[in-house]
């Protein structure tokens, strides 16, 4: 699951953001009580069962959708079948950034799909695919951006990037964040992403590029692949080089191994998932291809 939902940040950023949001939630006791009730209901509805795989889930199209058609829903279902189980999605009712804290750690569910393979909060499975950020442009435009060092990026009308992502960091690095800031905030009705989880809808990002309101988008490939595939305006996705560096020499990783996460002491379930991932590999690859997800060789 993408950093459009808080997972493609550095690990420290994920922990820091979750801590900040937890502090903010403490000021909102009534709403927090409602969330607690919702979590309790989810736990009651999804008691552990040897024949099911309880999957922590949050609505986040196109990755996770209640009708089961999301990319991560499809992969979870395939892996559960390879385990001889049935996938049971436990819907949290919160952004996916909370799945580990409010789902996995509270034992209302047992596995989170689509985490970075080095996520320190969980015990991760073997990676089952790798993907990364892409430059998104219209295919009918002579704007085949391949690097953040391309001087044309300083000349385009607007760029659309996700908040808290490597794209936002690089937008600041090349000196055009202030130029695009009002535009980006307009895409979320001017809700500032400070002490609250605010993110631009991937479908909106694709639409902005397709309609020409933004000339370049930068997004995590799996978040936008389905919308690019289905767009009536032909679009191109070009991988952002993984050796991208900021102007001060800092490395800015752009691609990430994807894994499933279980509680740190749940070694038995991890082993079972690892075996199922190997068994389900051809089906997972077929799903990724059908969705149009740009994939790279896993790093380990």
Curated annotation (Swiss-Prot):
Pfam annotation, one family: SBP_bac_3
Identify the InterPro entries for this entry.
Methanol_oxidation_MoxJ, Solute-binding_3/MltF_N, TAT_signal
Q: Indicate where this protein resides in the cell.
A: Periplasm
The signal peptide stretch is 1-25
**Listed transmembrane segments:** none
Q: Which PROSITE patterns match?
A: TAT
A single cellular component GO annotation: periplasmic space
This molecule's function is given as: May be involved in the assemblage of active methanol dehydrogenase and/or its cofactor PQQ in the periplasm.
Q: What is this protein called?
A: Protein MoxJ
């Amino acid at each position: 699951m993408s950093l459009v939902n808080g997972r493609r940040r550095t690990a420290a950023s994920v922990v820091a953001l979750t801590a900040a949001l937890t502090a903010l939630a403490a000021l909102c006791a009534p709403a927090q009580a409602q969330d607690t009730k919702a979590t309790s209901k989810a736990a009651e509805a999804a008691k552990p069962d040897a024949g099911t795989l309880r999957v922590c889930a949050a609505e986040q199209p196109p990755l996770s959708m209640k009708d089961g058609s999301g990319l991560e829903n499809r992969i979870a279902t395939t892996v559960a079948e390879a385990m001889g189980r049935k996938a049971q999605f436990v819907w949290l009712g919160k952004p996916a950034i909370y799945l580990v804290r409010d789902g996995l750690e509270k034992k209302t569910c047992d596995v989170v799909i689509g985490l970075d393979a080095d996520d320190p909060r969980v015990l991760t499975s073997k990676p089952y695919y790798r993907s990364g950020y892409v430059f998104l442009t219209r295919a009918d435009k002579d704007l085949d951006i391949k690097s953040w060092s391309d001087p044309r990026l300083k000349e385009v009308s607007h760029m659309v990037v996700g908040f808290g992502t490597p794209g936002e960091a690089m937008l600041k690095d090349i000196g055009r964040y202030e130029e695009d800031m009002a535009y980006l905030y307009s895409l979320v009705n001017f809700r500032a992403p400070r002490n609250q989880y605010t993110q631009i809808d991937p479908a909106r990002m694709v639409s902005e590029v397709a309609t020409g309101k933004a000339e370049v988008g930068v997004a995590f490939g799996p978040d936008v692949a389905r919308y690019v595939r289905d767009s009536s305006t032909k679009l191109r996705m070009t991988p952002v080089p993984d050796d991208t560096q900021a102007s001060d020499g800092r490395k800015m990783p752009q691609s990430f191994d994807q894994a499933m996460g279980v509680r740190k002491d749940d070694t038995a379930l991890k082993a079972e998932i690892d075996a199922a991932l190997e068994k389900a590999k051809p089906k997972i690859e077929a799903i990724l291809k059908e969705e149009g997800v740009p994939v790279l060789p896993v790093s380990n």
